[in-house]
A protein has these predicted regions:
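Glycine-rich, basic loop-to-helix element that forms the pyrophosphate-binding segment
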Residues: 60-77
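Short aromatic/hydrophobic "clamp" motif used to bind/position activated sugar donors
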Residues: 82
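Short, acidic, metal-binding catalytic loop of nucleotide-sugar glycosyltransferases
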Residues: 21-30
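The conserved acidic donor/metal-binding loop of glycosyltransferases
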Residues: 86-90
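N-proximal low-complexity "stem/linker" segments adjacent to membrane-targeting elements
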Residues: 1-22
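A conserved acidic beta->alpha catalytic loop
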Residues: 36-45, 62
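A recurrent flexible, glycine/aromatic-enriched loop bordering the glycosyltransferase active site
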Residues: 145-169
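Conserved donor NDP-sugar-binding/catalytic core segment of glycosyltransferases
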Residues: 94-133
Length: 180
């Protein structure tokens, strides 16, 4: 299945670079819709200089907010299945495969996320410290953890809506009561 990932960003350039690199580590050809939401931290220049034929770039000079750009990203994405990520998220191995196996029409599939211990625990996440700042991420430890725990959590599901998520594009517009 072909999938597009939408990643809006507001003043998170260095986190966005980590997000982009984590996706490209596992998925070289997946379509990305990367959105600069009026950032003032040189995200615009980074996006302009990004050489990747599988990236649709939306470079807004005006801040419009994530919700606006979720919709715009959906409109620009060329694939039937679309995921939304925050610009400070990184993915582990098999992220796409593990979320797609639960995807059905009319459903939103949210992935379990790992957050540092400054955030409260919740059933939708694992609290672990792999670094907070874009400079101190322990990516090798994160990948090792994902690989070791993938079997333990492979059939664990929870109810709720939280990022990152994947759904059929038409379902997004149906939820929004939007005809595109």
């Amino acid at each position: 299945m072909k999938i597009s990932l939408i990643i809006p960003s507001y003043n998170t350039k260095y986190h966005l670079i980590n997000t982009y690199n984590s996706i490209r580590k596992y998925y070289k050809d997946i379509e990305l819709v990367i959105i600069n939401d009026g950032s003032t931290d040189n995200t615009s220049e980074w996006l302009d200089n990004l050489k990747d034929n599988n990236v649709i770039k939306i470079n807004s000079k005006e801040r419009k907010g994530h919700t606006f750009f979720y919709d715009e990203g959906m409109r620009q994405a060329t694939n039937e299945i679309v995921g939304i990520m925050h610009s400070d998220m990184i993915i582990g191995p098999n992220y796409i495969e593990n979320t797609l196996k639960y995807l059905e029409r009319g459903k939103v599939v949210c992935a379990t996320r790992i957050e540092p211990p400054i955030h409260p625990a919740g059933k939708e996440k694992i609290v672990m410290d792999f670094g907070m700042d874009h400079n101190d991420l322990k990516l090798d430890e994160f990948e090792k953890f994902c690989n070791e725990k993938s079997n333990e959590f492979k059939d664990v599901t929870t109810k709720g809506i939280f990022a990152p998520w994947i759904l059929y594009k038409e379902d997004h517009f149906a939820i929004r009561n939007d005809t595109k």
